[in-house]
Swiss-Prot record:
InterPro entries: aa-tRNA-synth_II, aa-tRNA-synth_II/BPL/LPL, Phe-tRNA-synth_IIc_asu, Phe-tRNA_ligase_II_N, Phe_tRNA_ligase_alpha1_bac, Phenylalanyl-tRNA_Synthase, tRNA-bd_arm. It is found in: Cytoplasm. It is an enzyme of class 6 (ligase). The keyword Nucleotide-binding applies. This is Phenylalanine--tRNA ligase alpha subunit. Keywords: Aminoacyl-tRNA synthetase, ATP-binding, Cytoplasm, Ligase, Magnesium, Metal-binding, Nucleotide-binding, Protein biosynthesis. It comes from Geobacillus kaustophilus (strain HTA426). Its main location: cytoplasm. Its EC number is 6.1.1.20. Binds 2 magnesium ions per tetramer.
Length: 344
């Protein structure tokens, strides 16, 4: 019995050493240590041995089985390490090869213009105020001197959700909200960028969703001359140092007096061209002095405080600046269009 155990050990260790992969090694494990293997058979046949030999043969059988098990584990670890090394060799990276170029995106032209305008006014000391796109009727209309029954409240012009809730039609509600937070104490100096919504038919110059940037300054002794100086500086920074502006009388419910603001044409220098339609001037925004009713509803004493407000459409400015003839290009995600602005 002893000789058989020693021979089994020798054969098992020899086959373990010859195994070239994990499958072959597992076959050796099953052959020698499995339920039907020779080691198990020896242990089962110990009942036929004389009582005095059983302890010796049992101890030897366990010793042989332990030696085979240790050899299997050592060989398995070696084969697994060799497999890892083969995979690493096959997947080796040549660090001297040139990298694959990564296609980078670029800011959307509309985003570019909005950020440029924001940076310009932040440089003048303004802060950016943002608010909800789903707005109450009060802040969208009443707080801005648009009482019940005003044409701007027509269901055909605005996206109403309920009688008192709608998608904001301008970013002016943030002006009213900000003035309320100041509790009648100036100064207030903000710009309000964001998306707005109106019931409009989409075409080359109109969209049911577009962006606005509005500005507001409230303090003691604010005059129309302050408004003009601010907008002249804005026009020169955005369209070039040689630009001038002009005011034309207009009407907005929340400002009095109100003006339309034109900038001298940056394409023809005022001589007349297709961009300015031969006039030498391009309309870019609306503005005016904050209506006393708006100040009073926000908690400001209109006899002590005055202010000016202005509003512009970044889409129009981007169209003028980049020569874009259709507002729908901004929203159609056409890569052929967007790639034109990689180096603008």
């Amino acid at each position: 019995m002893k000789e058989r155990l020693y021979e089994l050990k020798r054969q098992a260790l020899e086959q373990i050493g010859q195994a070239r992969d994990l499958k072959a090694l597992n076959d050796v494990r099953v052959a020698y240590l499995g339920k039907k293997g020779p080691i198990t058979e020896v242990l089962r046949g110990m009942g036929a041995l004389p009582p005095e030999e059983r302890p010796k043969i049992g101890a030897l059988a366990n010793e042989v089985r332990e030696a085979i098990q240790q050899a299997l584990e050592a060989k398995q670890a070696k084969l697994e390490q060799e497999e890892v090394e083969r995979k690493l060799a096959a997947e080796a990276i040549d660090v001297t090869l040139p990298g694959r170029p990564v296609s980078l995106g670029n800011p959307h032209p509309l985003t570019r213009v909005i950020e440029e305008i924001e940076d310009l006014f932040i440089g003048m000391g303004y802060t950016v105020a943002e608010g909800p796109e789903v707005e109450t009727d009060y802040y969208n209309f009443e707080a801005l001197n648009l009482p019940k029954g005003h044409p701007a409240r027509d269901m055909q012009d605005s996206f109403y959700i309920t009688e008192e809730i709608l998608l904001r039609t301008h970013t002016s509600p943030m002006q009213a909200r900000t003035m309320e937070k100041h509790r009648g104490r100036g100064p207030v100096k903000i710009i309000c960028p964001g998306k707005v919504y109106r019931r409009d038919t989409d075409d080359a110059t109109h969209s049911h969703q577009f962006t606005q940037i509005e500005g507001l300054v409230v303090d003691r002794n604010i005059r129309m001359s302050d408004l003009k100086g601010t907008l002249r500086e804005f026009a020169r920074k955005l369209f070039g140092e040689g630009r001038d502006i002009r005011f034309r009388p207009s009407f907005f419910p929340f400002t009095e007096p109100s003006v339309e603001v034109d900038v001298s044409c940056f394409r023809c220098e005022g001589r007349g061209c297709g961009v300015c339609k031969g006039t030498g001037w391009i309309e870019i925004l609306g503005a005016g002095m904050v209506h006393p009713n708006v100040l009073e509803m926000a908690g400001f004493d209109s006899k002590t405080y005055t202010g000016f407000a202005f509003g512009m459409g970044p889409e129009r400015i981007a169209m003028l600046k980049y020569g874009i003839d259709d507002i729908r290009h901004f929203y159609q995600n056409d890569l052929r269009f967007l790639r034109q602005f990689l180096r603008v």
